[in-house]
């Protein structure tokens, strides 16, 4: 699919390609940047989950993304909803806790999750497996439960059988 090589209509290409797709939910995982691919995803989306990490400058990155979402909403005249800001890879360090608290303080109404840093997530990703497929491995069940809870928060109208 050619999305961003031609400037004319580039922002609408993904939305156009997804028209008529026979699915109730389509997850678009965008790169951690504010480039054309992310804008394509935002234009095609109905709701957005902003993913951040508990680190310095994270709040600035979230603010930039929220401004970009607002610009897309205004220019495309869409009903684009910010479903939440999720803090990903939340570790057990004092530094991680501090930056998580800063994000919560800045965006308290939007923060959902978090998703904790767990080896099971990296293991599932490396094996191209869903977390639920890791079974009894340490942390897999807890990590899967965090993602299930996050999904319920950001897509509350999705029934459990659809998840």
Regions found by a protein language model. Give the residues of each.
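Anionic-ligand binding region
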Residues: 60-81
């Amino acid at each position: 699919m050619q999305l961003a090589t031609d400037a004319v209509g580039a922002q609408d290409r993904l939305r156009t390609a997804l028209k008529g797709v026979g699915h109730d939910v389509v997850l678009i995982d965008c790169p951690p940047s504010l480039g054309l691919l992310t804008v394509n995803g935002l234009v095609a989306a109905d709701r957005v989950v902003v993913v951040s990490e508990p680190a310095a400058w994270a709040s600035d990155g979230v603010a930039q993304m929220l401004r970009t979402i607002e610009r897309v909403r205004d220019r495309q005249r869409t009903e684009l909803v910010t479903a939440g800001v999720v803090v990903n890879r939340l570790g057990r360090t004092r530094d991680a806790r501090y930056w998580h608290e800063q994000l919560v303080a800045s965006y308290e109404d939007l923060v959902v999750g978090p998703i904790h840093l767990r080896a099971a997530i990296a293991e599932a990703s490396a094996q191209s497996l869903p977390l639920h497929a890791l079974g009894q491995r340490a942390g897999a069940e807890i990590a899967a439960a965090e993602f299930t809870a996050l999904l319920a928060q950001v897509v509350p109208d999705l029934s459990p059988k659809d998840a």
